[in-house]
Each structure stands twice: as structure tokens, then as C-alpha cells.
């Protein structure tokens, strides 16, 4: 993730949060650009990736000159941008009780992302 932010001279902070049912997930908060901290003048935006993905989807450098990833464009426009991750992807492999080797760790579905993961991040934002 760090290299994708560095390519665009953006600064960020990883933010760990724990869900009500014990999963610890790392998401990312865009904090600034080459000019310094971003002045937040607009609403917060939580960007949520698709199935099988992670938050890097919103900071990918697109082909061609002059293209800026959506997350960076929103941040530079004054939004407070948060890149959300869910349990089970590479940024959500921790649990209070279970390890990724335990069958119980993987006993979740998409409903859990909306019932537990997203509300836990919203509490942080």
C-alpha cells in the first residue's frame, strides 16, 4: 500500500479497529499530499472494495497520463477519505480468539461485513 501512496506523494495512516465479534481490521485514512495535510472541507467518504479485493483498488494508478485514482481525487477535493477493508482479506486476518488456521475464523459471510465490519469503522470515522 505504501508504494501506491508514494507514487502520488500522498500521506496516509493505517487505522486498526476491532469489530464487536473480535476481528481486527486495518483500514487506511488519507491524510495529506505533497503540499501538506489535506484541509477537510467536505463529508467523509468510506470507500468499500468489491468481493475478493481490498482497499488498494482505490489507489491503483490508471493507465495513461493525467489519471488520478478516485481516492486521491476525493481527498484533494476536501473529503475525509477512508479506505475500508473487510475481515478475511490481507488487511483483516486477525481475531481475538481464532487464527486464520482455525475453521471458526472463516465462519462468516457478506452479512457480517455490514453488521460488524462497517459499523466498527464508522465508529472510528
Residue ranges and their predicted role:
Residues 2-5, 96-100:
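Amphipathic, alpha-helical segments enriched in basic
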Residues 2-9, 35, 74, 105:
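Intrinsically disordered, low-complexity regions
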Residues 103-125:
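Alpha/beta-hydrolase active-site loop
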Residues 6, 20, 111-114:
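Aromatic-acidic/polar surface patches that form glycan- and anion
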Residues 19, 24-26, 30-99:
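Short, surface-exposed "cap/lid" segments of acyl-processing enzymes
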Residues 1-4, 65-70, 109:
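Secondary-structure junction/capping motif
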Residues 1-18, 28-30, 40:
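An N-terminal hydrophobic leader/cap segment in hydrolases
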Residues 10-11, 56-58, 102-108:
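Short interface patches used for recognition in eukaryotic signaling and trafficking proteins
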